[in-house]
């Protein structure tokens, strides 16, 4: 609607500002600053209640103003791709020595609703020793882009992956004791 209209601008020192229903521009928090000398090349498009901004910055990613965030700001679109997790044997028992593959994705939830999800990171190949009870998957270093959870995916063929669980990022390990045949039933 016209009452929700906003005017956006970039000033001479690449500060992003917005005018909404008033007469004064307000500064907008920006995760990645606009590169010097390229402020006149900022391009924006509104979609689904957000303002997407394409501009030159130190990070080669599209940006978006998301008014639904707890602290509205211009953030990167999507999340950084995670590194591969590490996997090790744990416990004493008879966990089958069958080759399997693990990979992870970052997820950001806001009030239980998924806001964004990263691309899958590289997979890691793991064959249990046969004398443990679980394969312990350890989270890679968190990207620090607002991710709240991580999806742990497993595969028996390194092609078809299935989500095992999506714990909060504060939970840094997960113990998998499923057989590879059960992955597709998760």
Short names for language-model regions:
Residues 17, 22-186:
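Disordered, low-complexity "stalk" and linker segments at domain junctions of extracellular
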